[in-house]
């Protein structure tokens, strides 16, 4: 047995050695194959990068297990990429970076001992044989044992390591040799355990796969929830931001509206403050002016009060002298008639017994003075300004009544400077009833109504009142016209003052020439109104004896401030002349005097002038008809004393009315200065043999009084005064047409003209040469003449606009223009006269050919549209095309929108018209022919544009010089 065992062991040993020998070359051959299998494929990198690009891992920067589930690699199986991912993802993050996955895959192929097992599947028998050949089978094992063992291993189908296979081999061989019945049990156990291991391995892999799947699904869901949460948060943020923005915008708009309201309120308050400040300034200036006027009035009141006291004192003295003279004269007559009472049947005493020229006022003239000498001195100095007008008293009606001494029955002491406002000449000696309708027959008294203590009416300081006479009751008291409204009384109206003035004038040297003082002396504030020179009775021909008298009186009157402004100075320094009676009411519209003010001024003339005879007046308002007053005042009185005494009251009243009418005409008709008429004025001069109109002729021209205050006017006035005394026919202006006498149709003024007579006089002097009688007429040729065409659709208001422009009135019911209409409008713009030929075209289409013909010579165009019609505004471009077709270039245009008063029906906004005007480069405006709004301004602007265009055209003209031929020096060069 032992020997057989030894043989078997030896044979077994030999068999193992033979297997080892047979395996060595196989091992040598397998070694390079294994090394070759474990190497990294060359195309694996390119395939791996393509996978990263396809699955989007390259863009994300990492790879997930879901990406590997769809991966297909040539060097890996279907599930091997996921297994490699699980092996590399130690932290179970669910994603790996590209570098981590690539390095892990390379490590699996390079150094891992199970790489060959992962790469290859030994399903083929050849591979199994190669594997079994590598088992550590002892050499002494025979072929049968090897085949049985390999069959056992093949049945197990489990991969075991070489050490495990060696242990199984030993265990199986020992059981086979020692206990063969147990070898089958071992084989069944190994097969069963192998199957269980396989099942466990499969379960493990399935569980791992499920776990990984769940993990990936969980991660996907978490990521999805995260993204949804982020999206919801983003939407919530956007919604909150939108709500916040809307609230902010609403709050901002509300605050902006509140701020604008506050700003408007501040602007209104500022405007109100400015208006209040302006009103305060105006009120303060008015108050200051009123204070100044009050001061002036107080000073004038004090002066008047002082003068009144002085006049009262003089009046008292005069009363005393008159009472004394009356008493003495009465006593002398009584003494003279006492012896003649018992001889009533005898003849009348000789007129020479009682001399008519005895001295009736011994206290005034002295006991040794001669009355004849006094009267002769009065005749010698009658050319002075002092006059004594007297008439013999009537004879007594009965011897029983006391007779008035034959003294001066009526004494009128006056100065020539007070004659301007009189209604009859001062040389009229008859104090008969000449009361005008405006003045009661009692004569005018002073402002305070001084009365005689005995109840008798007192004389006015300057009125012609007769001394009390026996026939004072039979004859009505004469009403002298010095006290009419607007007249002034003389300063000295008593006998004593008359003689004092007479002595003062005799002491003065005679004047050397006719010169006017620019300022009037104090105490000479008198006003004069001239009678009409048209009366034939006032003109007695040139009297050589009156020439020196008139010259001296003229100079004396100018020295005394004759023709000055009036007793009451106007508060604003107006220089308009003061006219008496109704002549003030007939002043033209250039002197707007209210009725109440006029009546108050008349009353002040009737009262206040007697209280203030000494106020100073300026010479600025000297009337231009002064020589006529002087001529009538200083006419000879020979032959009038007897006639005046025999006139009846009817003739005197008619003469008084004639004087009133003449005083109304004198400011308009008797202006001897042809170059001082207001423009426009027409003056007609009669022929040398033609007489002026009579005293009662109607007024031919109602012109306003001129304020003549310049030295040239005064010099002309004095020259005319001298020329009246020269022999020869007299040529006086008989008709003066002024603005007030012949009003022209009112049109919108291109320039505001002041209504000051001075300004009108200066304009007349500038526009006409001296002596030009037609200077006031409008110029025949304008400065500029332009051709203007109105374009626009029908019914836009072109005809209404032109009608309002010409007639200053809106005409209703105008029909559509047929063809074309033509008007001429004269405008005064920038001191230049523009004559605009305005062509009103028809808007109907059938007249457009005629309109195109007119456009060829157009220099200005007015494009008019209706703001209530969008179609008319659109057709403006059609009219522009018509202008272009007509070949008109450089035309001044105005775009004008009419009917702006129809705001509710407006279809064309103002901004649209302004934009179109800016696009065309023309001026723009909107007007309303119904309301008369903005009618004249566009035409004035068009006139200025036409003038500027003409100026530019003149400036752009180039002078064409004729080429000059150069002369050659000789015939050959």
Curated annotation (Swiss-Prot):
Example of a GO MF term: GTPase activity
Biased composition regions of type Low complexity, renumbered to the chain: 513-524
Biased composition (Pro residues): 428-440
List of residues binding GTP: 792-799, 840-844, 898-901
GO biological process: histamine secretion by mast cell; histamine secretion mediated by IgE immunoglobulin; mast cell degranulation
Annotated lipid attachment (S-geranylgeranyl cysteine): 971-972
Entries under InterPro entries matching the protein: EF-hand-dom_pair (IPR011992), P-loop_NTPase (IPR027417), Rab (IPR050227), Small_GTP-bd (IPR005225), Small_GTPase (IPR001806)
Keyword check for ATP-binding: no
Basic residues composition bias: residue spans: 1-21
Membrane topology: Lipid-anchor
Pfam families xrefs: Ras
One GO location term (cellular component): plasma membrane
Family to which the UniProt record says this protein belongs: Belongs to the small GTPase superfamily. Rab family.
Protein's recorded name: Ras-related protein Rab-44
Species this protein is from: Mus musculus (Mouse)
Gene name as annotated: Rab44
């Amino acid at each position: 047995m032992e020997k057989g065992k030894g043989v078997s062991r030896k044979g077994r040993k030999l068999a193992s050695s033979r297997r080892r020998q047979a395996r060595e070359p196989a091992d040598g051959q397998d070694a390079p194959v294994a090394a070759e299998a474990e190497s990294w494929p060359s195309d694996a990198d390119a395939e791996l990068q393509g996978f990263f690009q396809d699955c989007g891992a390259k863009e994300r920067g990492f790879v997930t297990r879901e990406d590997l589930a769809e991966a297909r690699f040539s060097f890996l199986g279907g599930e091997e990429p996921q297994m490699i991912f699980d092996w590399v993802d130690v932290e179970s993050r669910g994603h790996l970076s590209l570098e981590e996955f690539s390095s892990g895959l390379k490590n699996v192929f390079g150094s891992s001992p199970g790489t060959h097992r992962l790469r290859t599947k030994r399903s083929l028998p050849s591979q199994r044989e190669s594997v079994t050949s590598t088992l550590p089978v002892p050499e002494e094992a025979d072929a049968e044992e090897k085949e049985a063992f390999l069959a056992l291993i093949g049945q197990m189908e489990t991969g075991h390591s070489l050490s495990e296979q060696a242990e199984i081999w030993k265990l199986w061989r020992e059981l086979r040799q020692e206990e063969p019945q147990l070898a089958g049990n071992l084989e069944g156990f190994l097969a069963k355990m192998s199957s269980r291991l396989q099942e466990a391995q499969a379960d493990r892999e399935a569980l791992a796969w499920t776990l990984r799947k769940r993990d990936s699904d969980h991660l996907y869901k978490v990521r999805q929830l995260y993204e949804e949460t982020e999206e919801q948060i983003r939407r919530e943020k956007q919604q909150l931001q939108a709500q916040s923005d809307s609230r902010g915008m609403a709050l901002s708009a509300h605050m902006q509206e509140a701020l604008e309201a506050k700003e408007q309120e501040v602007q209104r308050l500022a405007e109100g403050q400015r208006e209040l400040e302006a009103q305060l300034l105006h009120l303060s200036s008015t108050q200051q002016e009123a204070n100044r006027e009050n001061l002036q009035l107080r000073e004038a009141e004090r002066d008047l009060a002082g003068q009144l006291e002085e006049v009262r004192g003089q009046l008292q003295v005069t009363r005393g002298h008159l009472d004394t003279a009356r008493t003495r004269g009465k006593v002398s007559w009584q003494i003279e008639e006492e012896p003649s009472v018992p001889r009533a049947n005898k003849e009348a005493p000789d007129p020479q017994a009682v001399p008519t020229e005895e001295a009736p006022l011994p206290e005034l003239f002295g006991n040794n003075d001669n009355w004849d000498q006094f009267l002769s001195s009065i005749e010698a100095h009658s050319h002075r300004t002092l006059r004594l007008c007297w008439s013999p008293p009537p004879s007594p009606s009965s011897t029983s009544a006391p007779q008035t001494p034959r003294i001066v029955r009526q004494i009128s002491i006056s100065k020539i400077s007070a004659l301007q406002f009189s209604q009859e000449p001062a040389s009229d000696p008859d104090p008969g009833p000449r009361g005008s309708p405006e003045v009661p027959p009692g004569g005018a008294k002073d402002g305070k109504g001084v009365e005689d203590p005995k109840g008798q009416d007192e004389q006015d300081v300057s009125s012609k009142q007769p001394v009390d006479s026996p026939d004072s009751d039979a004859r009505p008291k004469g009403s002298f016209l010095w006290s009419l409204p607007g007249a002034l009384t003389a300063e000295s109206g008593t006998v004593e003052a008359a003689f004092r003035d007479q002595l003062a004038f005799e002491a003065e040297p005679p004047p050397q020439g006719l010169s006017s003082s620019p300022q009037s002396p104090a105490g000479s504030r008198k006003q004069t109104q001239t009678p009409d020179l048209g009366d034939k009775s006032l003109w007695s021909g040139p009297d050589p004896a009156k020439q020196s008298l008139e010259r001296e009186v003229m100079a004396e009157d100018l020295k005394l401030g004759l023709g000055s402004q009036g007793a009451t100075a106007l508060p604003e320094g107006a220089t308009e002349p003061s006219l008496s009676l109704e002549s003030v009411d007939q002043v033209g519209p250039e002197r707007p005097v209210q009725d109440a003010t006029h009546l108050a001024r008349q009353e002040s003339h009737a009262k206040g002038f007697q209280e203030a005879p000494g106020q100073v007046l300026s010479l600025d308002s000297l009337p231009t008809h002064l020589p006529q007053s002087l001529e009538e005042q200083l006419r000879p009185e020979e032959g009038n004393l007897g006639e005046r005494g025999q006139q009846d009251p009817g003739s005197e009243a008619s003469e008084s009315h004639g004087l009133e009418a003449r005083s109304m005409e004198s400011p308009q008709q008797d202006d001897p200065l042809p170059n001082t008429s207001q423009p426009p004025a027409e003056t007609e001069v009669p022929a040398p043999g033609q007489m002026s109109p009579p005293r009662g002729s109607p007024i031919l021209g109602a012109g306003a009084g001129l304020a003549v205050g310049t030295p040239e006017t005064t010099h002309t006035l004095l020259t005319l005064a001298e020329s009246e005394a020269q022999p020869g026919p007299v040529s006086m202006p008989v008709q003066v047409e002024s603005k007030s006498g012949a009003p022209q149709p009112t049109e919108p003024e291109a320039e505001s003209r002041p209504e000051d007579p001075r300004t009108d006089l200066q304009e007349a002097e500038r526009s006409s040469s001296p002596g030009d009688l037609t200077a006031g007429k409008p110029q025949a040729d304008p400065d500029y003449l332009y051709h203007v065409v109105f374009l626009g659709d029908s019914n836009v208001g072109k005809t209404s606009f032109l009608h309002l422009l010409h007639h200053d009135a809106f005409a209703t019911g105008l029909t559509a223009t047929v063809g074309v209409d033509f008007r001429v409008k004269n405008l005064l713009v920038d001191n230049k006269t523009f004559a605009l030929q305005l062509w009103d075209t028809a808007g109907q289409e059938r007249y457009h050919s005629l309109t195109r013909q007119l456009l060829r010579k157009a220099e200005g165009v007015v494009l008019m549209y209706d703001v209530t019609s969008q179609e008319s505004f659109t057709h403006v471009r059609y009219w522009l095309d018509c202008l272009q077709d007509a070949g008109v270039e450089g035309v001044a245009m105005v775009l004008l929108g009419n009917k702006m008063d129809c705001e509710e029906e407006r279809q064309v906004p103002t901004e649209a018209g302004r934009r179109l005007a800016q696009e065309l480069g023309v001026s723009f405006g909107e007007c309303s022919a119904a309301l008369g709004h903005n009618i004249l301004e566009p035409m004035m602007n068009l006139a200025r544009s036409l003038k500027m265009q003409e100026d530019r055209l003149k400036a752009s003209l180039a002078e064409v010089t004729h080429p000059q031929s150069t002369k050659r020096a000789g015939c050959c060069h």
